[in-house]
Amino acid sequence: MGLKAWSRVKSPWIMFAPCGGCNGCHIEIVACLTPRYDVERLGIKITGSPRQADILVVAGHVSKQITKALKRIYEQIPDPKVVVAVGSCALTGGVFYGEGDYVSYGLGGPVNKIIPVDVYVPGCPPKPEAIIHGIALAIQKLKEKV
Amino acid sequence: MVNLRVLVEAFKSLARCVTIKYPFGPPAYTPEGMRGKPEFDMEKCVGCGGCFNCCPPEAITIMEEDGKRRIEINLGKCLYCATCQEVCPEDAITLTSKFELAVYDLSQAKETVEVSQVKCENCGCYFAPEPQISKVRDRVLSKINPVQKETIEKDFQVYSKYCPTCRKQLSFKLNYHPRKYY
Amino acid sequence: MSFSYENLKEKIVSRLRENLGEDYLGEYEGREGRLYVNVRSGTIKLIAEMLKNEFDARLVTISVNDFGFKGFEVLYHYAFDYKDKVFTKNLTLTVKTLIPRENPEIDSITSIYYSAVYAEREMSELNGITFKGLIDPRHFVLPYEWPHEVEGVEVKKIVDFAPEEQRKKVGKWIPLPVDIEGKPELSIVPIGPFHPAFVEAWYYRLKVDGEKIIEADLKTGFNHRGIMKLMEKRSYWRNIYISERVCGICSHTHTSAYCRTVEMLGNIELPDRGRYIRTFIKELERIHSHLLWAGVGMDLIGYKTAFMWFWRDREHVLDIFEMVSGNRVLHAMNIIGGVRRDITRDMIPKIERKLDIVERAAKNYVKMATTEPLIRKRTVGVGVLTKDEAKEVGVVGPTARASDVGIDVRKDDPYLAYGETSWDMVTRPDGDVYAKVIVRLLEVLQSISICRQCLDLLKTVGGPIQAEVPREFPEGEEAIGRVEAPRGELAYYIRSNGTHIPDRVRIRTPSFLNNPSTLYMLRNQTIADAPIIIASVDPCIACTDRSIKIVLEDVKEKKVKPVSFSMLAEKSRLKSRRM
């Protein structure tokens, strides 16, 4: 591994895109930064700009009004990039999907209908330790792509 | 001017560290009764479908093919609410304390159990899961009057080979009428 | 206005009879002393003025029932809690009128009650009702492709079933008109939908002159899930899991409000242990929500160290949740008629040890907030909401209590164990961001004392934790349940139709009323103060964007639901089978 690749893998920068939903997954993701779970000791930093990110974390069901914004953010992140989907609503629509023939009209679809996803983290909501485990798998994938 | 409160808190955290060492050590707090991944007990499941009826987001599906009934939990849709654990009559589902469920491929996130079914000798249809029939027989025989036990056991062996429609059609041939037990 | 609360019902009924004369059609009493009144639709504005001027009423919400070819029934719910009183059951008045289906028009009351703006915008978009004189008739929540692309079905196929006038076309959201031509020093600053300072997605447009804000405009609707429509397809018991996921921070409050309303429908009484456990979890949730909000607020000021301290001490509360219910967030403890899990004897000493740690930390934070110069400089005198403005906009919860308006559902309409424990309501007269911080931190201390009293009661009382519940509820019953969430008053309205599926569920969350008040508070402040002002009302956008039911029925015996073609076919088969 060259120097560039080693530095990318050892300190990945994460962009967090909250796409609606009930906020349960959002507070568990922000709790990863607090003193008990402290991901900054592993070299991870949260940025606000997609141009500076390596990993995109998406949580929440994606409503129809927000699909365009999510696609634009995905296209602005430079390669190589990894997408992580967190929580039941992001994987399959969760409890808002409806049953039988009926699909709720406010749903833009689970995340993998809109952008390609690499790692899936199930849970409702998943514990912060489970999210850290998911991000560790994402870093493994980033190593292969670099 | 240095803030005194910040200094005091800093010294307190040096003395006793709050951060856990998770990927390189044990997780923070897993009490019993925690709701993690649901798991099936293969020996106890009778394939009744009670969990399928009560699941709020419809994450449990039942498929029947080749004489086997397969029950599947889609872990991507599951809410981890423990209703199936409360409803199951045989205590075959328990929610363990496993929470590391991340996968690369969504079709791998599921939990299955398979139960074989009994085939009717007359018409060839699959009419009931086999563990249900054997458990019902054991429970009835353990609570019944010992005088009638032998006759009932013999009858059970004959009747459990036919589905309910065929049993009615062949009732004369099989000597199948309830009054003979009075 | 000086009057006593003793004969309030009789006074209201007699005044309504005098003023309306023939247009007054009758009244009846519902569960727990709620009063329902039937009137003709032309008198709505007159009733609103009379209630505001003579009785000092407060509008709770507006909801609509759809009865098919009989027409729409519009309901206005009022509460009377601006006066000081002791523990008495408070009155909730509901005014019902019927409007015809061919011409659904009714007067708007936004000129009298500003808090009706959001409710009327939602009704006009989702049911097709025209409110004459609505202040702000713009697009609210639906997706932009409605109704042209509904599940991929072309509109031409559905138009046979419903007349074209009834389907309101939803255009794009247009911001308020801005006249900046000729004034080159003014400009527009948009914030959102994705912004690193906010955890949710919403969109503010600020009209600024240099650094000073002149006007603000808000667009929500990015989080619309169609929850109220989902709830009308599942049984009463399964809806608990949907109402739990309306908001993740106040999830137990939503399920308690839903269960309280359904228990009122069926006249079910909770056993003692069930009540105390429910109250205990509710107060713990209030502590966790206020500590979360305080941390986020400190982060927006720039005091990141305090953000870490608040969230570190919040972890002890989440540990108690995990021990008692099995999950840190979204603990599914409620069920109709009681709770699911019990608190055993060996859990109680561990819980009390953790509560001691949280109490010591909370007292420390109150001292810090009153003496720390950074917090005082950024929050004192910033974003002031006066008492008259608070009453006019109709805010609820700690936002109102920080402006000297003393309303709290736990005191006005006591439920669960709040009548049996002793605690105080906290108010402050200033109305700025500093007052809101102090009110919330002092409420944490009050909640800890309620929790300790509940644990003492649990040590002595035995018995079951659930009551017997019927599967179906009688036809034509309706109920309104009100509950105090960490952000304010939460109201559910449920109507039953004799089966195991509810007919209509209407949710009105506190953020519905609190969010428009930021537009008042943002005037004449600087851009740098905008995030902390917006965050001071504790906005929970997940609670603001749900939906209601849309049923278009034609007079020619064909039922229509404009969401899926297979549902149309199924409904028309059902209806012809019933006829």
Regions found by a protein language model. Give the residues of each.
Chain A
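Iron-sulfur-associated redox domains of electron-transfer enzymes in respiratory
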Residues: 1-146
